[in-house]
């Protein structure tokens, strides 16, 4: 966490080159698990936000959207809509005038997405209710949301998968 509340994550990878295809580029998928407890466990809801702009002359317009995620599920990030995921507490208000709900906004990496054969790579965000048995990705995210439980005013866990394309170079020895 930074002083301004921003969560900054970093990921790196290392290892030997593939012995039979040493110059082949490939993708790395990173998944972060965020157990969001604003004002304690429970009372949190998630929203998929969007921002679209129309630059057709003579008028330019912008539209902001906010869709409440009401059941556990996986979500796709659409770069044309500048999607973000907003996690908001229903009872905790900040000091602005008028007071607004306290929230975190998850802004995805702008590096593109990878769709591989693993089921968890088919979506960018996953919203699930907290379950202590679901701490690791090994069981695959689609299994965590298959019950489609309510996510309104609950103890939420947000899973975010970002991808990086890796072109091999001389440092990868």
What are these model-predicted stretches?
Residues 2-6, 16-173:
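Extended effector regions of multi-domain proteins
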Residues 9:
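Active-site-proximal segments of catalytic enzyme domains
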């Amino acid at each position: 966490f930074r002083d301004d509340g921003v969560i900054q994550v970093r990921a790196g990878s290392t290892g030997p080159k593939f012995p039979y295809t040493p110059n082949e580029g490939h993708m790395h998928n990173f998944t972060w698990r965020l157990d969001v407890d604003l004002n304690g466990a429970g009372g949190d809801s998630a929203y998929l936000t969007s921002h679209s702009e129309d630059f057709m002359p003579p008028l330019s317009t912008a539209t902001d959207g906010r869709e409440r995620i009401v059941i556990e599920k996986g979500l796709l990030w659409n770069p044309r809509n500048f999607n973000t995921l907003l996690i908001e507490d229903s009872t905790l208000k900040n000091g602005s005038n008028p007071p607004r709900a306290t929230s975190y906004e998850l802004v995805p990496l702008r590096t593109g997405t990878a769709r591989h054969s693993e089921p968890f790579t088919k979506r960018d965000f996953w919203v699930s209710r907290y379950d202590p048995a679901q701490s690791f990705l090994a069981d695959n995210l689609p299994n965590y949301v298959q019950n489609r439980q309510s996510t309104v005013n609950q103890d939420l866990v947000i899973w975010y998968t970002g991808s990086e394309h890796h072109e091999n170079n001389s440092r990868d020895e």
